[in-house]
Amino acid sequence: MADLEPDSKLGPDSKPGNDRDARAAARLLAVQALYQMDIAKTPLENIIKEFVSHRLDVSMDGVDMPEGDAAYFEKILRGVVENQTPIDRQIDDCLSENWHLARLDSTLRAILRCGVFELTYGGDAPTGVLVSQYTDIAHAFFDGPEGGMANALLDRVGQGAAPDTNLFGTQTPE
């Protein structure tokens, strides 16, 4: 199981204050907020208020990252919550026959939901950037195969792959 705080594998890739970095920080914060909503059952409005008031400053292993873009953080979070049923269906359609979203770690579910939301409903960044950033977030939280799984699933969603083909390239039963 992943910790709520990522390790040093994910860090700022340019100078603080950059809009791109603020959005990358907002993506990480949205993942953390969804995790908290899932685990602690914190209501959406409370989590938005908490994060915007107290948690937009991101620090990992003592390294300060750019402040998260509050509006973008809220857009991702609200978008995932409002579209959770079709997002979850889209994720389930990409998983192998023996795997379902409910079986995944809460952190991985949050990463996939945020990534699928941006790829499908609201991301204005290029597909490759979104897949890369959410894959980096997965690698920051997990040492195992979860990063590769996130990459494969988000890449499939980003390319608009047929939903009847799972991550292992086999057709799902009709």
Predicted region positions:
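N-terminal interaction/assembly modules
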Residues: 1-174
